[in-house]
């Protein structure tokens, strides 16, 4: 989608898609310490944690995500797949600041409002039967969920920043709002 974009990949999940919040915290701290040097403009966070467990670690994730946003990194997070009930958006998608992505073609897509009455997700993208890499043998597989929808929005943002490299995250979010139907 954005062939001129460079990528840094941070592994926070195992081959089964399972992970610890501590792995995400470690990756987020590294990104925070190195985002200027590495010229990281967008953080695609296709991982979600339920807000009700490991509260202290989830608060750390939210704090780091918000700090990255304040430093000028556009943070795009998956809404999670615990919907369609209200209050089902996962951490870090519940952050007031960041852009949270749901899947318009998956009924399990996380849905707001958050417990702080924030309307989430802000944007929807395709997330059903998306062709992706397999984890075991490098073949392609079909995957479904908000983790598949989130990179589509991140790619669109990369194109926007290619033309407007000095846009702040707030302006990027507003541009998305103003162009969505």
Each language-model region and where it sits:
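Hydrolase catalytic cores
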Residues: 8-14, 43, 127-181
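Short, well-structured alpha-helical segments in soluble
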Residues: 28-38
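Short, conserved glycine- and acidic-residue-centered signature motifs
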Residues: 20, 57, 94, 146-149
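Subtilisin-like serine protease catalytic core
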Residues: 1-22, 36-41, 94-97, 113-120, ...
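Extracytoplasmic/secreted envelope proteins and their assembly/folding machinery
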Residues: 21, 25-28, 62, 86-89, ...
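A generic structural signal for short coil/turn motifs at secondary-structure boundaries
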Residues: 15-20, 51-55, 142-143
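Catalytic-core segments of hydrolase enzymes
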Residues: 40-133, 177-180
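Residue-level detector of functionally special positions within alpha-helical transmembrane segments
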Residues: 4, 46, 80, 145-147
């Amino acid at each position: 989608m954005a062939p001129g974009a460079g990528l840094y990949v941070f592994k926070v999940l195992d081959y089964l898609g399972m992970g610890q919040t501590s792995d995400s915290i470690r990756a987020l701290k590294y990104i925070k310490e190195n985002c200027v040097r590495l010229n990281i403009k967008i953080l695609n966070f296709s991982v979600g944690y339920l807000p009700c467990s490991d509260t202290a670690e989830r608060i750390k994730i939210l704090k780091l995500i918000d700090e990255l946003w304040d430093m000028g990194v556009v943070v795009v997070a998956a809404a999670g797949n615990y919907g369609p009930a209200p209050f089902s958006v996962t951490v870090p998608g519940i952050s007031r600041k960041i852009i949270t992505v749901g899947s318009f073609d998956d009924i399990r897509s996380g849905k707001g409002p958050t417990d702080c009455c924030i309307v989430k997700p802000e944007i929807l993208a395709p997330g059903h039967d998306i062709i992706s890499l397999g984890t075991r043998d490098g073949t392609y597989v079909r995957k479904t969920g908000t983790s598949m929808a989130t990179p589509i929005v991140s790619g669109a943002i990369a194109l926007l920043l290619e033309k407007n490299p000095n846009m702040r995250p707030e302006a990027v979010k507003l541009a998305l709002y103003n162009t969505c139907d």
